[in-house]
Each structure stands twice: as C-alpha cells, then as structure tokens.
C-alpha cells in the first residue's frame, strides 16, 4: 500500500530540525543493513529513502512526514569502515544528540541483519539506548536471504544475549524489504502507539 509520505528536509544538527508535535520514529542501524530499502517498503514509496549499494550513503538526519500523522527519521548508519574516524565521531555525536534531545521522539527502531550473530556495535547501541532511557525495538532485516531455520537460530542467539542483561526484552520484528513481510506488523505497532499518545 502506498502511503502519503513526504520528505521534509535533511539536517546536520538536531537543533536545526523543525519543532514538531507529531510522534517521531527513528530508524537506525549499521551501514548496509537495508534501512533505506525497509523505509521504502514500509511506506510503499519506491524512492522515498535513497538506497545505495555503497554503505554510508545516509550522512544526515532525514525527516519525512507519513500520512500527516507521524514523522519518520532516517538516521546515519554506524560501523562504516571506509569513513574517516573524524566523520564517524561527527555522525555518532550528531545521532546521539538527536536521540537524547528530540522532544517528540517516540521510539527508536534499531535495524540488525538477520543473517548475523549479535555484533558488538549493535549491542553497544542497545546498551546506550537503554542507559539513556530511550524506548527502542529491534527490526531484523533481510530474512528472505536465508531459511526460516537459520533466522530462528539467529533470533535465539539475540534472545540469549539480551536476556543476560535485561529481564524485559525489546519488541522484535522480522522483515523483508523484498517480500514486504513484517511491514504490516510494524505499521500496526506504530499505529497503536500513535493512538495511545492521542488518548
């Protein structure tokens, strides 16, 4: 289903982002995790978020208004090895400043590649979000690239690792940008949160 999705603008500092009262959902993940493809699949708008075979394409905070009811924030990926250290530090600071200070931020969706065991950089992001009291959910991408058995194996690994530090696990979604699997569940979840906020 094609949604009414419009690009607002790109920003290199959260303080430059417009003050918006609508609930905002941030999407973040390692470079090349399939974030842009998922955003396009989620909204049904093919080129809403620019995709690239080269990691590190997203370098700014990109805001979109969705159905005129909520805001989608496409954040720079982390773990891009070819970026200079100064660039990685700059992106990291920009993203963390946004996540800590954006007043209408409702939930962070942390995207992880379903083909990989828990990675240090992903776990560091999760720990940072939790320690700063920022609500987040996990989105496992590219489940179409492997068997259900392998996906479940990776999911079990994540559950085990997270259970070692947290009693309550974050909500998890299994998605495929190719087939669209998981996008309906994700949109339903966002809609439920929006209704709770409205009430």
Curated annotation (Swiss-Prot):
Originating organism: Cytophaga hutchinsonii (strain ATCC 33406 / DSM 1761 / CIP 103989 / NBRC 15051 / NCIMB 9469 / D465)
Functional note: Necessary for normal cell division and for the maintenance of normal septation.
Signal sequence interval, chain numbering: none
Binding site for Mg(2+): 36, 58
Residues binding GTP: 29-36, 56-60, 74-77, 141-144, 175-177
NCBIfam families with a match to the protein in the record: GTPase_YsxC
Protein family membership: Belongs to the TRAFAC class TrmE-Era-EngA-EngB-Septin-like GTPase superfamily. EngB GTPase family.
Sequence ranges assigned to domain EngB-type G in this UniProt record: 21-196
GO biological process: division septum assembly
Entry annotated with the keyword Disulfide bond: no
Cofactor: Mg(2+)
Origin: domain of life: Bacteria
Keywords, ordered alphabetically: Cell cycle, Cell division, GTP-binding, Magnesium, Metal-binding, Nucleotide-binding, Septation
Lineage: Bacteria, Pseudomonadati, Bacteroidota, Cytophagia, Cytophagales
Name this protein carries in UniProt: Probable GTP-binding protein EngB
Molecular function GO labels: GTP binding; metal ion binding
PROSITE patterns tied to this protein: G_ENGB
HAMAP family named in the record: GTPase_EngB
């Amino acid at each position: 289903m094609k949604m009414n999705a419009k690009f607002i603008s790109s920003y290199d500092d959260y303080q430059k982002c417009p003050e918006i009262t609508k609930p905002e959902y941030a999407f973040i993940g390692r470079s090349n995790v399939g974030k842009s493809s998922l955003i396009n699949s989620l909204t049904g708008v093919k080129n809403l978020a620019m995709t690239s075979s080269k990691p590190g394409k997203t370098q700014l905070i990109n805001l979109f208004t969705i159905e005129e009811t909520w805001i989608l924030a496409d954040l720079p990926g982390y773990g891009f090895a070819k970026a200079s250290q100064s660039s990685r530090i700059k992106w990291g600071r920009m993203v963390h400043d946004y996540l800590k200070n954006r007043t209408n931020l409702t939930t962070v969706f942390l995207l992880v590649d379903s083909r990989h065991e828990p990675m240090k950089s992903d776990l560091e992001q999760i720990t940072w979000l939790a320690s700063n009291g920022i609500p987040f959910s996990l989105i496992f991408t590219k489940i179409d690239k492997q068997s259900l058995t392998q996906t479940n194996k990776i999911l079990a690994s994540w559950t085990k690792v997270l259970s070692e530090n947290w009693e309550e696990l974050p909500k998890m979604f299994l998605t495929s940008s190719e087939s669209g699997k998981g996008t309906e569940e994700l949109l339903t979840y966002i809609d439920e949160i929006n209704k709770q906020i409205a009430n």
